[in-house]
């Protein structure tokens, strides 16, 4: 039986590594004044009239929405409704960012324009975040098992135990990260996630804590593949995640591990 959530053409490496996907995208501004529980942002949505999964993305400590805007447009162009947010203050801690990601999802579902609301399948939601926003992503995933996917990007959190998370989680770390070193953040986070869930750890080679702030084909490719696989239940994308990217010498990926098959 055909998957009712399948959107877009059969995927290829070239399609996933390109700067934009197959869907034309429009934007809707969310002013700080109209936002409840977060600092405003931008909603990116496919122009094609259909229903899509929805994703909220948080910046990191001291970061603004501009630092993650590329991800909003990139992911929406593959068939998702995406909100990239400003936090209430740039110094908000990870657990506050979790609350704000949740508020942003609620805004898209309940308070956005009818054009946006009509495109959202509210049963298929996901969250992403950079740095402390990645920590917030983990926190919200631990609080909302109904989420379909979580993607922390070079995440930072003081809590190292995420054994209560059941949401399919892709953690992306960076080998040269000195702000949230993978040895004390991304790797322990990944290891603490239950081995029974769908999870993956991808470590970028030659990359710093701020790799997610500029367009990055590896982050784009594997984030889209993860969202497609778990938000859309689209098994056409499993081929990119299992066995996943080759790691090691001269690659863009330092390390990849997962609980494949999924």
Curated annotation (Swiss-Prot):
Pfam families: PETase
GO molecular function: cutinase activity
Compartment annotation: Secreted; Periplasm
Keyword Membrane: no
CC terms in the record's Gene Ontology section: extracellular region; periplasmic space
Catalyzed chemical reaction(s): (ethylene terephthalate)(n) + H2O = (ethylene terephthalate)(n-1) + 4-[(2-hydroxyethoxy)carbonyl]benzoate + H(+); a butanoate ester + H2O = an aliphatic alcohol + butanoate + H(+); an acetyl ester + H2O = an aliphatic alcohol + acetate + H(+); cutin + H2O = cutin monomers
Active site: 131, 177, 209
Residue sites binding poly(ethylene terephthalate) per the record: 61, 132, 156
Primary localisation category: secreted
Statement on biotechnological application from the UniProt entry: Has potential for application in biological recycling of plastic waste products.
Entry EC number(s): 3.1.1.74, 3.1.1.101
Cystines in this chain: 242-260
UniProt keyword Mitochondrion present: no
EC class name: hydrolase
Transmembrane segments: none
Domain of life: Bacteria
Keywords, ordered alphabetically: Disulfide bond, Hydrolase, Periplasm, Secreted, Serine esterase
UniProt record similarity statement: Belongs to the AB hydrolase superfamily.
Cited function: Catalyzes the hydrolysis of cutin, a polyester that forms the structure of plant cuticle. Shows esterase activity towards p-nitrophenol-linked aliphatic esters (pNP-aliphatic esters). Capable of degrading the plastic poly(ethylene terephthalate) (PET), the most abundant polyester plastic in the world. Capable of degrading the bioplastic poly(lactic acid) (PLLA).
Protein name per Swiss-Prot or TrEMBL: Cutinase 1
Gene: cut1
């Amino acid at each position: 039986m055909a998957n009712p959530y399948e959107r877009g053409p059969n995927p290829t490496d070239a399609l996933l590594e390109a700067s934009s996907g197959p869907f034309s995208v429009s934007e809707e501004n969310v002013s700080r004044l109209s936002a409840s529980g977060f600092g405003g942002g931008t909603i990116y949505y496919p122009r094609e009239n259909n229903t899509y999964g929805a994703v909220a993305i948080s910046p990191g400590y001291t970061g603004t929405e501009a630092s993650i805007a590329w991800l909003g447009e990139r992911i929406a162009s593959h068939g998702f409704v995406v909100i990239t947010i400003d936090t209430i203050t740039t110094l908000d801690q990870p657990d506050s960012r979790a609350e704000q990601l949740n508020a942003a999802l609620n805004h898209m579902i309940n308070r956005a324009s009818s054009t946006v609301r009509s495109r959202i399948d509210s049963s298929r939601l996901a969250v992403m975040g950079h740095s402390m926003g990645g920590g917030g992503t983990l926190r919200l995933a631990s609080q909302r098992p109904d989420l379909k996917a979580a993607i922390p990007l070079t995440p930072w959190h003081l809590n190292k135990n995420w054994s209560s998370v059941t949401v399919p989680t892709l953690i992306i770390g960076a080998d040269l990260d000195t702000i949230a070193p993978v040895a004390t953040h991304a790797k322990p986070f990944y290891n603490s996630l239950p081995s029974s869930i769908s999870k993956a750890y991808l470590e970028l080679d030659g990359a710093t804590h701020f790799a997610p702030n500029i367009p990055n084909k590896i982050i784009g490719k594997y984030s889209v593949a993860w969202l497609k696989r778990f938000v859309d239940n689209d098994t056409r994308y499993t081929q990119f995640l299992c066995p996943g990217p080759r790691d090691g010498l001269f690659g863009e990926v330092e390390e990849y591990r997962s609980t494949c098959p999924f």
